[in-house]
Amino acid sequence: VDFSYDDEQNGLREAVSALLGRAYADSEQRRRVVAGDPGFDEKTWSRLAEMGVLGLPFAESDGGMGAGPVEVSIVAEEIGRVLAPEPFVEAVVLAGGLVADLGTDAQRAEVLGALAEGSLVPAFAHAETGTRWEPTAAAVTATEDGGSWRLTGVKEPVPNGARADVLVVSAVAGGVTRLFLVQGDAEGLTRTGHRNHDGTRSAKVEFAGTPAQPLGEGTGDRSGAVEKALARARVAYGHEALGAMETALTTTAEYLKARKQFGVPLSKFQALTFRAADMYVSLELARSTVMWATLVVDADGDVVAAADRARLQTSRASRHIGKEAIQLHGGIGVTAEYKVGHYTSRLTAIDHLLGDGDWALARLAGSVDAHETVDPLA
């Protein structure tokens, strides 16, 4: 398997890294941005659009760049490296991906073109209270009256739901899960935003006879498309976690070299360097799994199973690296003024977005029905 990047991909990484590095040069700069609404920097979002980043995975005919999952993964990793709060995965990979997969020509042109230009931010309203990352809807229903559709019910939490200009909403219609587009200023739509512990934003979204437009044509069940879109987003979040874990590890290694105890740097204590080495092993195991999963997405293979494997390994590595980064720093690691705690907080949030490690392990274990399934020689 070839995990190397070509010149264009390396150029993309350098450009995105430079932009986000300037926007979030220090942790104080990020704290100022996430302290106010909408929780990310609109100017940085616009600059990403100018670079073509927001249209990367979409077809050129829809206003995009026609790139693939590898390019998307590069952007996600650089976002994680500096904890940039811009909703790239939520808006581009998840909500935008569903519109690209299922939308009519007119819907794709309207939503994806504006998203690529940076003038529209979509969000996927799917999670419901009491559910655990299922691809089906239950609490929101869609009813048709005279050719018009209206939604009733509650979605919570909806990442970036309070800021979104348009919502892609899953709802029950005719006994199956379907998808609808709802404008941010629609009648009967109430959104209550809140700040998450990692500084990102989510919202409670209530529909009270809210006008909606079916996404795409046909009346079939869309839960399969939802599951595939969620899997792609899990892989992208895996790359965001890789960027965050790498920064946490690098920061910890630098601290061990600079901080002195008993007159010598902490890096001279073998027990501490062994712990840092174990962090590196966890990072590289996660990196290999997530990069492999990205190639599965690129080849349109079994995306769901690959995403579960990537999520499990990323979950384990995130917990290990986040915990050790704080432990090896000592008390300063949990202060708001120092960045390591913020990286651990974001890694914890990613671990619970769209399914945590225990959930992924249970799904993988449920797919094992015979010894041959796990026998590499079979």
Sequence positions of predicted segments:
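A structural signal for short hydrophobic beta-strand segments in well-ordered beta-sheet cores
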Residues: 140-142
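A short, Trp-centered hydrophobic/proline-enriched beta-strand micro-motif
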Residues: 118-129
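Short, flexible active-site-proximal loops enriched in glycine and acidic residues
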Residues: 82-91
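Alpha-helical interface subdomain recognition
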Residues: 1-83, 102-105, 118, 148, ...
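Short loop-to-beta-strand entry elements in the cores of soluble alpha/beta enzymes
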Residues: 90-99, 238-240
